[in-house]
Amino acid sequence: IKEMPLVEPFPVKTLKQIIAQIFKLYKTTETSIMLDRLKDLGFKYSTVSGATVSTHDVATSSSKPEIIANAKKTVDKINKQYSRGLITEEERYESVINVWYKAKDQVQAELQEIADKSLTNPIFMMMKSGARGKISQFVQLSGMRGLMSKPGGRVIEIPVISSFKEGLSVSEFFLSTHSARKGSADTALNTA
């Protein structure tokens, strides 16, 4: 390994493979020494890099307003079909949920493209390395939160369109915390 050229960053998956190979080839003692050195290198270069995160690093979707507008039009058409008796309540509900899932997926796809192209953005570096965060969390940060669930597990058909960067309205904040409050209450009751 010492003589091998470093041609790309080491994501967590690659590091796991390297550690597994070293563990197979050497004893536990040598592996633990290597891991200590690897940890020290990680601390050293993460400090030297000076990577910081600011709100300017949070890329946003330029086509999100258009995606949301199209989704709202589609939901209006679905609701008109229901009011005319062309579809059942369950069909209406499922269709509306699917429209909002697709809208969030479109926003996520655009943000994934931005992430794939960005080599120096610290948020994307952490995400790509596997150190912190996933694309779904980044979508909530800069795209849209999407659909939330009721405490019983049923999905609320009104989406949280705003992202954390944009800021949530009072109603969106309430929707976002709906099932979290139930989870906290259940935990408190179970531990009491």
Regions found by a protein language model. Give the residues of each.
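Feature marking long nucleic-acid-engaging regions of large polymerase/nuclease enzymes
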Residues: I1-E89, Q137-A192
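Gly/Pro-rich turn-and-neighbor structural signature
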Residues: E90-S142
